[in-house]
């Protein structure tokens, strides 16, 4: 079983799209291994973000692991296209599809890693039937759809429950948190059992490289 590593995955939803390439290079140069790509359709969540063209444009210019978070209805319609555009991991919401196992199998068939996500109102137990089938579980710590929200503390309790499920099964599944993560609460998320940290507005502001390095140091 591989060891669990702490990983920072900055969300480009909070980047400056006028200079997206520069912002990505800033976090990459700081030693950040992953990049979180939030895709929103205006149906599953109220906001619309970006989609395959942005992912396809980014892919040739970075070796970072592209962690693609689909906040879209019926994600099984598009997972193969996102994989083809350069996603390393395709992550979808349990609440967005009636065929969770089918969606997992579609992603797995592309050779990409698979993630499943739950919203704040969804209980931790919802992921239990799928733990052996996926590479990562994402627990939303805010309502998905908008950046810059405050973390919902109760959601971290779900992280602890899911980490115990993973450990009890002898798995090495990554456990990601997304929403309202800053330097002052990232250690709390790690202590609850998360090992992949999504941070958006806390990284993509002012001195981006310095912000990223501060997170990496705090997460050691």
Where is each model-derived feature located?
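Conserved N-terminal beta1-alpha1 strand-loop-helix module at the mouth
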Residues: 2-91, 96-99, 106-109, 113-114, ...
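A short, mixed-charge helix-start or loop-turn motif at secondary-structure junctions
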Residues: 6, 144-145
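Short beta-strand segments at enzyme active-site cores
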Residues: 35-38, 175-177, 199
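Short gly/ser/thr-rich secondary-structure transition/capping motifs
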Residues: 117-121
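Active-site/ligand-binding-proximal alpha/beta "capping" segment
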Residues: 143, 150-191, 195-196
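Acidic, Mg2+-coordinating phosphoryl-transfer loop and its flanking beta/alpha structural elements
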Residues: 194-199, 205
């Amino acid at each position: 079983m591989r060891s669990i590593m702490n990983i920072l995955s900055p969300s480009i939803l909070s980047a400056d799209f006028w200079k997206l390439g520069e912002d990505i290079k800033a976090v990459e140069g700081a030693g950040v291994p992953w990049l979180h790509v939030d895709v929103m359709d205006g149906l599953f969540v109220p906001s619309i973000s970006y989609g395959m063209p942005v992912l396809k444009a980014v892919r040739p210019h970075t070796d970072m692991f592209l962690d693609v978070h689909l906040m879209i209805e019926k994600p099984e319609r598009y997972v193969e296209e996102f994989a083809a555009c350069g996603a390393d991991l395709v992550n979808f919401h349990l609440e967005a599809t009636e065929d969770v196992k089918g969606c997992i199998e579609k992603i797995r068939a592309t050779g990409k890693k698979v993630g499943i996500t739950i919203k704040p109102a969804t209980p931790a137990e919802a992921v239990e039937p799928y733990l052996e089938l996926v590479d990562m579980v994402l627990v939303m710590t805010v309502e998905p759809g908008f950046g810059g929200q405050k973390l919902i503390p109760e959601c971290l309790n779900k992280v602890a429950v899911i980490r115990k499920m993973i450990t009890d099964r002898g798995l090495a599944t990554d456990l990601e948190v997304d929403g309202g993560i800053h330097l002052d609460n990232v250690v709390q998320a790690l202590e609850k059992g998360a090992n992949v940290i999504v941070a958006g507005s806390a990284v993509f502001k002012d001195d981006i490289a310095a912000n990223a390095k501060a997170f990496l140091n705090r997460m050691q």
